[in-house]
Amino acid sequence: MNIRKAVLADSMGIAKVHVDSWRTTYKNIIPAAFLSNLSYDSRTDLWNGNISKEGNYVFVAENSDGDIIGFADCGKRESNHFPESGDLTAIYLLEEYQGKGIGQGLLEQVFLQFEELGFNRIFVEVLEDNKTRYFYEYYGAELYKTKKITIAGAELNLLIYEWNNIRNVLIKF
């Protein structure tokens, strides 16, 4: 497995992981019609923008064949007004690669990037029914607040977690 910073040529591979992992992660959480309508093409366009955006950092995990099997995205959301803070905006792996330490590797790269930026307080948003919340809790994230959101007509609970000292996370790797 290899983890590296993403380049524009990775957009299609990231989009495939994004769509496929949403379909498995959010099955029975987000309406099926919404998930089935997700498009590789539109997500490729999204990732072209995300990779190119200044202040946004995207990392990919590749298998031994060089195929992208996971990714993480981080930076600072426009809605984040806290000084010296950032946001983990996405971390997804294809289902068959979960539980093998790859997510940990991606999280480490994100936190090393935050350390380089001088960020010490990190936020991540996760749907309440998404089991990834336990991954964040394992690495020391604490619940900051909750809010209701609507996706495809379904009202869902969004949990906002925070890490308030990235050094405490980095020593776990």
Put a short name on every predicted segment.
Residues 1-2, 12-16, 89, 104, 122:
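Short amphipathic alpha-helical segments
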Residues 5-9, 19-29, 35-96, 107-109, ...:
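Acetyl-CoA-dependent GNAT
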Residues 67, 90-108, 115-117, 127-134, ...:
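Conserved glycine-rich acetyl-CoA-binding loop
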Residues 86, 120-133, 137-139, 145-173:
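C-terminal "cap" of GNAT-fold acetyltransferases
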